[in-house]
């Protein structure tokens, strides 16, 4: 979702609350819970899951390994659920031509640097840069080149934009900010 007027352009960034992250977190949680239950049933010698008898899986070494995979999967799943609940990576890009200021805001992990806020003048923007990496896993990323600060990404690195979409986004940004476009 974007909001745009004659002098101000605000672009909202999704962050980690994407459908794919919800899907992976659910699959990982259920799979690791299954591994942990199988490991526990082999330790107890009882059928906690009626799919197969617990005598088929000996606790040492199969049950221990299944329990370890289950615990590791629960840790990774909890990490994913935390990033989803904290909405890490979400925020906005605000371009204000009237004030001559660009503000980039992102939510990070809890702590001292939870709020990531970058602010600089439009006159310090050298160009809008498109970085294209072709191959099996092609990647197209849009950067804003800032004098003295380097390049700041405007699109997510995992966002799979088509060449037409990335060109349109770069053209819109460059036109609004009145800066040139570079392609690498």
Swiss-Prot record:
GO terms for cellular component: chloroplast thylakoid membrane; photosystem I. It is a multi-pass membrane protein. Coiled coil: none annotated. GO terms for biological process: photosynthesis. It is found in: Plastid, Chloroplast thylakoid membrane. InterPro entries: PSI_Ycf4_assembly. It comes from the Eukaryota. Its main location: plastid. The chain crosses the membrane at residues 22-42, 57-77. Keywords: Chloroplast, Membrane, Photosynthesis, Plastid, Thylakoid, Transmembrane, Transmembrane helix. Belongs to the Ycf4 family. Seems to be required for the assembly of the photosystem I complex. This is Photosystem I assembly protein Ycf4. The gene is ycf4.
